[in-house]
């Protein structure tokens, strides 16, 4: 916490979610069912590249289910996006049967998540907030941080897909 003052909060969580195209008939309604379809190699799945944070979370989910990403990619079951927008676009357009994105990106793209990854699957995506020790106006920063903790602010954040903590 070097550089942080006495006020540090775990502010928001962005869930890692599974989405499918609208009207999908593949029966993918959970990460468990996704894993079964990937094992059967009967779907096309989109995830972020390994240098994209959501791709790294997806790799952890694949490992959680003992799925071999390289083998699935070689079998033509996985397609990649160089950023999360590419993943949401492939899902929205129905180019793939399922994909993993952040809840906020699903919201922005008009996608409805069918499942949320648990912390055991891939950890948590946490956004902290803090008042810096070197803040030129620490009192105003503390007041703003206090505002961020209100129900009003939580409603705004939750309205775009975040989970207030």
Language-model segments: which ranges?
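Short, small-residue-biased leader/transition segments that mark boundaries at the very start
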Residues: 3-8
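Periplasmic-binding protein-like
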Residues: 107-146, 148-165
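A ligand-binding cleft/hinge motif common to bilobed small-molecule-binding domains
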Residues: 1-2, 91-115, 119-123
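Short secondary-structure boundary segments
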Residues: 47-50, 102-105, 160
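Ligand-binding cleft/hinge of the Venus flytrap
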Residues: 31-81
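Hydrophobic/proline-rich hinge and linker segments of small-molecule sensing/allosteric domains
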Residues: 11-30
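Short, hydrophobic alpha-helical packing/hinge segments within bilobed ligand-binding/sensory domains
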Residues: 87-88
